UniProtKB/Swiss-Prot annotation:
The gene is TSF1. This is Elongation factor Ts, mitochondrial. It is found in: Mitochondrion. It holds the Pfam family EF_TS. It comes from the Eukaryota. Belongs to the EF-Ts family. The keyword Membrane does not apply. The keyword Transcription regulation does not apply.
């Protein structure tokens, strides 16, 4: 009786068995990884589930990323994120008649470890978020103030725009892209803060131009500085490539100065940490450098922006400096 049952069971297995799915080739795995940067295991799983069809495997990976990303985000959401990086995007430095004023943004994207913080995918996401923030921002507030309180919920709901390929159609929102990153790196990832500087360009025929200076060091600290140039015919000066080159050097030096010193304000006679009261070492690189305020006045005179007893020239209106993980006022 037992022998007959075993024969029947064996026959049944043979009758209903099917050929195993063909093992994904190394070529297909490599192609899928190149297009998606997933792990070898995940690429094989996607191809096996899609009958070795690359297009179907891409769709499978996208669905899997959404599902696994949401699960991991929920699981890792409470873990601290002390590491990360600062990213700056400047879409328009301003001061030229063919661009629409100043448009820039700075963001802080956090993760759990420095290893992930230096990951190329993580850095690319941060750059894209900063680019998106600069692109979608509207001007609010006074002409001399940064838009410091950029609403993170608005930014997370916005389509993520590529910094490297701005014309590429978005494949998801900022929020969904952060969840995807959590799934890829296996760590909690959080967007901590963002600011945008958006200032309309004054009249091309006027005597005032706005500019933005920026600097990021080691992706851990970054700064933005809003400048005003006041002089008759400033638009003509800005049309000169040589003048713009010298101006950009000054702007970069100011942004570096703000990072390199304990800068708490722009210009205050009672505050020794104010920018204008500091030796401008990032410009001349000498220990006995003249003060920032003096350098700006001398530079303006040399460039013909400042006449005697004139209130023109170049001036710093506002600035922001960030460091990864620092405490800040909400």
């Amino acid at each position: 009786m037992y022998r007959n049952c075993r024969k029947a069971f064996t026959f049944s297995l043979r009758h209903y068995s099917t050929a195993p799915t063909e093992k994904p080739s190394l070529k297909l795995v490599a192609e899928l990884r190149k297009r998606t940067e997933v792990s070898i295991t995940k690429a094989r799983e996607a191809l096996s589930a899609s009958n070795n069809d690359v297009s179907a495997a891409l769709e499978w990976l996208q669905k899997d990323l959404i599902t696994s990303g949401a699960k991991k985000a929920a699981k890792l959401g409470g873990r601290p994120t002390p590491e990360g990086l600062i990213s700056v995007s400047v879409l328009s430095r301003g001061g030229e008649s063919h661009v629409a004023g100043v448009r820039a943004a700075m963001i802080e994207l956090n993760c759990e470890t420095d290893f992930v913080g230096r990951n190329e995918l993580f850095g690319r996401l941060a750059a894209d978020i900063a680019h998106t923030a600069a692109y979608i921002s509207d001007r609010t507030g006074s002409a001399t103030a940064f838009n410091r309180a950029f609403p993170l919920d608005v930014l997370k709901d916005a389509p993520l725009l590529s910094q490297l390929n701005p014309t590429a159609p978005p494949t998801g929102t900022v929020g969904s892209s952060i969840r995807d990153m959590i799934s890829k790196v296996g760590e909690n990832v959080s967007l901590r803060r963002a600011l945008a500087v958006v200032e309309n360009s004054p009249s091309p025929n006027g005597d005032i131009a706005l500019r933005i200076g920026s600097y990021v060091h080691d992706y851990k600290i970054g700064s933005l500085a809003l400048l005003a140039l006041k002089s008759r015919g400033i638009s003509s000066s800005l049309n000169s490539d040589a003048f713009r080159e010298r101006l950009e050097f000054l702007e970069r030096a100011l942004a570096r100065q703000i990072l390199g010193f304990e800068t708490t304000s722009v210009n205050s006679s009672e505050d020794q940490t104010s920018l204008y009261n500091q030796p401008f070492m990032m410009f001349s690189r000498e220990m006995d450098s003249p003060l920032v305020g003096e350098v700006l006045r001398n530079w303006s005179e040399k460039e013909g922006l400042l006449k005697e007893n004139s209130d023109g020239g170049v001036a710093v209106l506002d600035f922001a400096k960030w460091k990864v993980g620092e405490t800040f006022d909400e």
